[in-house]
Curated annotation (Swiss-Prot):
Its cofactor is Mg(2+). The keyword Transit peptide does not apply. This is AAA-ATPase At5g57480. It catalyses: ATP + H2O = ADP + phosphate + H(+). Residues 497-512 have a biased composition (Acidic residues). Keywords: ATP-binding, Hydrolase, Magnesium, Nucleotide-binding, Signal. InterPro entries: AAA+_ATPase (IPR003593), AAA_N_dom (IPR025753), ATPase_AAA_core (IPR003959), Mitochondrial_chaperone_BCS1 (IPR050747), P-loop_NTPase (IPR027417). It comes from the Eukaryota. ATP binds at residues 244-251.
Length: 520
């Protein structure tokens, strides 16, 4: 044994001497060329081929990387020896993942492949036009050369299908918001996310059942309409405008839509977006099967009716697109600073965000705008193709009142005295109480259901009498039905749009006459 260790020590000494001799005789370039040649010879005689899937592809996140990560997370819990366990805040499940620089064996159609999760430190960059993550992440797929042509394409297609299936089954939807001031997170993403666990559904939503069914049918047709949109040459997207008084359930409607379709939500805070280009970058980083929300759009930036701000619009206008002309002016889109925060988003930038060329960089996405005052919005935001469906979130009516009684008290129509029910039906329209007001009245007395019914009826009566006395019913328009209110509000917006178009045509005609005079 002693002789063995002596021989081993002598051999190591010889190897160390040879290494130092090679480093002193052969330059680094020659050694590098030799290693490169040796690797090529090794790969020629190797029976395997390797495929690298990096996390970031150019400026965008590699969708295949995300799909592989999701696919392997469903199998490593069974087959992996070393796992990475994570659980997000407010999440209801633990996520399994492959540890850094660890590997796992997978089988597809009888062929065995090897996946390795490669994580290396990124070299410090002296200059970069955008920050990159400190770590380079990727997966390496090892397949035998003889199996490459047999399974590679079908295996990757299978991974994409399985990843989409896992996303659909995953109950933890995500709620995203854009980072403050356009900053990026540690992975270079402009969106921050938390698990979305809002309990609102269409069953609990206080709204006329016929209207809810109409919205649900429209959402279902959209989600199943990929072939239809391709056949008609339209981008696979849809826009919804939710408008009505505060407390009528606009946010609950958005949550119900997300839960019904299983989509993630991107809550876009426009006041944190400083330019049109930044808005486009945010759009590029959104995923398919998502709802992009801009709440209270009339309050976010200056996108109100251009006619009301016509005195601030620049006199130098293009001849071709009235909407883009006015959107880039200082009065409509806020070119220049908005509120002193350097916000230069224009109306044309927002319109291109919703239905321009950049809106087609993804598919199966829904845009939802909310506002309390539809008449204040610029008519360019309201036309079909941008906001395809206008949904009026009304005051509490009798059908929605019955839903609230069922939700909060567990009372059906048959559980309430008939005379009391008739009184409620007679006064609920005149009271103009929002679903939020009715819900609060029921919540505070939910332990005493009879008292809750009694006090709610008294509140409905007193508010109805006060509205009739003060002439405030339906905003002073008299006792109008919900349909008449919707028609009246949208008619005002359309009339405003026609007036703007007439005003633009007059200016274009005047400019044409000036040009002709100069030519003569």
């Amino acid at each position: 044994m002693k002789e063995y260790w002596t021989s081993l020590a002598s051999l190591l000494g010889v190897l160390a001497f040879c290494q130092s001799l090679m480093q002193s005789i052969f330059p680094p370039e020659l050694r590098f060329a030799f290693l490169k040649f040796f690797n090529r010879i090794f790969h020629v005689f190797s029976s395997y081929c390797y495929f690298d899937i990096t996390e970031i592809d150019g400026v965008n996140t590699n969708e295949l990387y995300n799909a592989v990560q999701l696919y392997l997370s469903s199998s490593v819990s069974i087959a992996g020896n070393r796992l990475s366990l994570t659980r997000a805040v407010n999440s209801s499940s633990i996520t399994f993942g492959l540890s850094n620089n660890d590997s796992i064996v997978d089988t597809f159609n009888g062929v065995t492949v090897l996946w390795e999760h490669v994580v290396t430190q990124r070299q410090t960059q002296t200059f970069a036009w955008r920050p990159l993550p400190e770590e380079k992440r990727g997966f390496t797929l090892r397949i035998k050369k003889k199996d490459k042509t047999l399974i590679l394409n079908s295996y990757l297609d299978y991974i994409m299908e399985r990843a989409n299936e896992i996303r659909r089954k995953n109950q933890d939807r995500l709620l995203y918001t854009n980072s403050r001031g356009g900053s990026l997170d540690s992975r270079g993403h402009p969106w921050e996310s938390v698990p979305f666990k809002h309990p609102s559904t269409f069953e609990t939503l206080a709204m006329d059942p016929r209207k809810k069914q109409q919205i649900m049918d429209d959402l279902k047709d959209f989600a199943e309409g990929q072939v239809f949109y391709q056949k008609t040459g339209r981008a696979w997207k849809r826009g919804y405008l939710l408008y009505g008084p505060p407390g009528t359930g606009k946010s609950s409607m958005i949550a119900a839509m997300a839960n019904y379709l299983g989509y993630d939500i991107y809550d876009l805070e426009l006041t944190e977006v400083h330019s049109n280009s930044e808005l486009r970058k945010l759009l590029m980083k959104t995923s398919s099967k998502s709802i992009i929300v801009i709440e209270d759009i009339d309050c976010s930036i200056n996108l109100t009716n251009r006619k009301k701000n016509s005195s601030n619009v620049s006199s130098q206008r293009s001849y071709y697109d009235a909407e883009t002309r006015n959107g880039s002016g200082s009065g409509s889109g806020g070119s220049g600073e908005e509120g002193g925060n350097g916000n230069t988003i224009t109306l044309s930038g927002l319109l291109n965000f919703t239905d321009g060329l950049w809106s087609c960089c993804g598919s199966e996405r829904i845009f939802v705008f909310t506002t309390n005052h539809i008449e204040k919005l610029d008519p360019a935001l309201l036309r079909s193709g941008r906001m395809d469906m206008h949904i009026y979130m009304s005051f509490c009516n009798f059908p929605s009142l019955k839903i609230l009684l069922k939700n909060y008290l567990g009372y059906g129509v048959e559980d309430i005295n008939g005379d009391v029910l008739k009184e409620m039906e007679m006064v609920v329209e005149k009271a103009e109480m929002t679903p939020a007001d009715v819900s609060e009245a029921l919540i505070k007395n939910r332990r005493d259901k009879e008292k809750a019914i009694r006090e709610l009826l008294e509140d409905l009566k007193s508010r109805g009498e006060r509205n009739v006395k003060d002439g405030k019913l339906r905003g002073g328009s008299g006792n109008l039905t919900e349909l008449e209110v919707v028609e009246e509000q949208e008619k005002r917006a359309i009339d405003s749009q026609n007036e703007d178009e007439d005003h633009d045509e007059e200016e274009i005609e005047l400019e044409d006459n000036i040009c002709k005079t100069r030519e003569d």
